[in-house]
Amino acid sequence: MAKITKTFQYGKHTVTLETGEIARQAGGAVIVKVDDTVLLVTAVAAKSAREGQDFFPLTVDYQEKFYAGGRIPGGFFKREGRATEKETLISRLIDRPIRPLFPEDYKNEVQIIATVMSMNPDIDGDIAALIGASAALSLAGTPFKGPIGAAKVGYKNGEYILNPTVTELKDSQLELVVAGTANAVLMVESEAELLSEEVMLGAVTFGHREMQKVINVINELTVEAGTKPSDWVAPAKNDGMIAALKEAVGDQLASAFQVRDKLQRRDAISAIKKDVLGALAPRATIEGWAAGDLAKEFGELEYQTMRGSVLSTKVRIDGRALDTVRPISATAGVLPRTHGSALFTRGETQAIVITTLGTARDGQVIDAVSGEYKENFLFHYNFPPYSVGECGRFGAPKRREIGHGRLAKRGVLAVMPTLEEFPYTIRVVSEITESNGSSSMASVCGSSLALMDAGVPIKAPVAGIAMGLVKEGNDFVVLSDILGDEDHLGDMDFKVAGTAEGVSALQMDIKIEGITEEIMKQALQQAKAGRLHILGEMAHALTTPRQELSDYAPRLLTIKIHPDKIREVIGKGGSTIQAITKETGTQIDIQDDGTIIIASVNAIAAQAAKSRIEQITSDVEPGRIYEGKVAKIMDFGAFVTILPGKDGLVHVSQISSERVEKVGDKLKEGDLVRVKVLEVDKQGRIRLSIKAVEEGEGVQASAE
């Protein structure tokens, strides 16, 4: 195939799609150029599904090569290692709008690899990767019901910005990524500075409207490349098997879905499945029905039963009305030795959230393609298997845990203090101890309480809620605070976090086409009502940050010195700073601009270290009297330490008003004496006098 190139203007950027020259053995391969940021995105689909495959094995890997930024990786091996958090999050970002566009029965393995090969640090690779994945899949001839487009939306001064740069995002009140087909939005990921629901919805519709040019260009590229449609055909339904299964199940599933407790309901459904499949086993053997096909159709009956019941009765499987939030319990300060903690329970979803305060040196150093930087707010989400009553792998966080942690972090970012306002590194950990839907939003609520319990001056409490949707034709219902089953069997997972004032984070994943602006508007309005209700319940535990830090949290004192004085504080070979930290038991961080941060669990020790530093950096004042210690005896006088690191000479003629024949007759090393500063010359040498003090001149000052 000859090289094909398509170029179009997308916001302020020129986007170029190229195919036919690179990675020609891949099913589909596209070079995506957004100014100087260049990605190679490939898509390969297996010719057939593996024997017994019962799920769609789609994998997406986004990777940023260090050579793209002209850097060599750090570490011993000097090559890229496992996926970073950013790479994992963008991989998920690509997966989410693509997965629902494959047919339900398609089980062939599909792999998408997006490689950043050149990076302009001001143009991130996420949107280019989404565009490239859509184009590569369209070229690969898979049964992909795309293409999709993607756009990033910023918001400043009341106006939306299409595909803002990294620099522009620093001043933007919004960072929103939206992806979808020509007719429908499929995915939204965003963080915002407490914006209204109307502004958020406007950003989604703005992005969807602008991305149409991407979809049009990909369609043109596919036509020019002569891509053949997929020849995959969905397996025919076995009507006889389905009818027999429905007859055997009867109304048992409808009864099981009336059980309110999650585990009891799950056990009841499992028992029905076991009995029904057992009863049908003899006929299945005769008819040649596969056990996997029977199990799959049983799952389809579950899907239809739950959805039909909710649509017809407007009552949910746990007995709630459509807009009712589950019972909430919230407690702050549940763990005695942590810096801040909270227990948040909503129905059968529960999180213990812990906040830990550290110093600047506790921040995480990120070695990125664009350069090193430090992250001083960390949010980690853990989802152990016991939280859903199961056994499972336990260890390093999976992609889902990384994604949920990032979403919860987005939820509270808008209310966090700056490092200047609160100079601590903050780590929040959410331990999910029970889960039945919306555990990431429980993490948002719990983190808000844990941060306030730790004394972090957040601007306002934050709550989060997950919304769901059941839609058949034109009939639909929006569900507030969804259960796990409602998420699994529903058409939408729509998470919203924010304060009473506005939205701080919004994430939406839609499994079907046809989600209208009306549906999104209703979901946002219902989410706001739910969020305000949850904030009211959380207020029973804590409404404002505690005024005092935990007894076990480090106290930070910040002082500012002239940068020229830094070497005096550090001392020769670090001797001075080491002596201060050892004697006071504190931790001291010195920044290049002269900012010094002193950390200690003991406030008195921190104050002592501060006093020492102030003494070292203070200037010696001529005419002032100091109390010092004799450091060294010489024939011509004595050197006296009047401030840490500052010695002056008392000449033999200045020791006493009487004649002194031998310095050692009057002074000994270690003696404490009061001296007056006569002069500090241009070389910084200090002339002192004991005689002048005895004569009563000067103003007294003391120093250790």
Swiss-Prot record:
Keywords in alphabetical order: Cytoplasm, Magnesium, Metal-binding, Nucleotidyltransferase, RNA-binding, Transferase
Protein name: Polyribonucleotide nucleotidyltransferase
Cofactor dependency: Mg(2+)
First-level EC class: transferase
Domain KH: 554-613
InterPro entries membership: ExoRNase_PH_dom1, ExoRNase_PH_dom2, ExoRNase_PH_dom2_sf, KH_dom, KH_dom_type_1, KH_dom_type_1_sf, NA-bd_OB-fold, PNPase
Keyword check for Cytoplasm: yes
GO terms of biological process kind: mRNA catabolic process; RNA processing
GO molecular function term, any single one: RNA binding
Domain of life according to the entry: Bacteria
Listed SMART domains: KH, S1
Domain S1 motif: 623-691
UniProt keyword Chloroplast present: no
NCBIfam families: polynuc_phos, PRK11824.1
Main location: cytoplasm
GO CC list: cytosol
Organism for this UniProt entry: Xanthomonas axonopodis pv. citri (strain 306)
EC number of the protein: 2.7.7.8
Gene giving rise to this polypeptide: pnp
Pfam families on file: KH_1, PNPase, RNase_PH, RNase_PH_C, S1
